Amino acid sequence: MSNVLNMNNYPIPRLDREVKLRENLLRFCRLEPGQVWFDRQNGHRVGCLDASSVPDVITLCRNDRASLAIHDLPYNFIAFEQKRIDEFISWCRKVVNNSSEVLADSSSLYLWIGADQKNGFAPLPELMLMMRETGFVSRSFITLRNQRGYGTQRNWMSVRQELLYYIKGRPKFNPQYTDIPKAVKGYYKNVNGRLTENSARGRGETIRAGNVWIDIQQVFYRLEENVNGCYAQKPLKAIERIIDASSSAGDIVLDFFSHSGTTLLAAEMKGRRCLTMDIDPIFCEITIRRLEHFRQTGQMGWQNSNPFAVELGANGNK
């Protein structure tokens, strides 16, 4: 696996659970709530802001309008019972409405969301119903298959991540192709009086990506792109696929829940401008450091080291 490297072994635990570590890391964060970091090189912005706040969204986006938004909604609040489902959906409505105000008339919106099989698959169905009341039109329900899952011997293993795709207006869509070769042949069809086999009718030598993604590696500690401490990191390849499909070079991409900074990094690699925010100063700092780290080293993450290894040292408690 080409993106598996041997790096320094300085892991840190999940940052949402370690109160003392968080207090220590806040000393190294350059942003405080309400502040925005501006990238002088390519025009990216990172804000320590609240996605449900209209003034905060305006602070980040100003008069810019994006062609694409990719939000990894913090559905773990439901799993940890920090919010009731109805409160969470009401909050999501604010986030979606705020996104709509800073998206172009023709644009795309992607929402990562969970489905708790122990709780009626909440909050997925509730979010779907809420989205019917917005100005967005549903386009696809995508499943990203994890290589590892969880469950018991009395149920099917849970190995999926859910991604909802919506649009407003008539945005561009560029079909994407996987690295999977076409293996199944023999489906013939008469096209303009000529009998053709299915592989001859296709536009690529490999399989076109559908709404079930089985070809993307789940992030784990041996991958270069891994960012220790970030418990909800999405694969860089998944975000790159979305950006390639639903935007063009030079477009603006939004992400209101930056977390590990994957959307910002993908935008940098794909020649887009990213306007992103996180309410947590630590994840804002990680996002900025990940971009800087990539520009300095060409590496997409820290594998089993961490963004604060210099400050914390090998034992993680300087």
Placement of each model-derived feature along the sequence:
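Conserved SAM-binding loop
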Residues: T287-I288
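Core catalytic lobe of class I
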Residues: M1-R17, E23-M277, P281-C284
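C-terminal catalytic and target-recognition region of SAM-dependent MTase-like enzymes
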Residues: N315-K318
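Conserved SAM/SAH-binding loop
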Residues: A51-V54, S305-G313
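Short, flexible loop/turn segments with low-complexity composition
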Residues: Y177-P181, G298-A309
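Catalytic-site neighborhood detector that most strongly recognizes the C-terminal catalytic loop/helix
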Residues: E292-H293
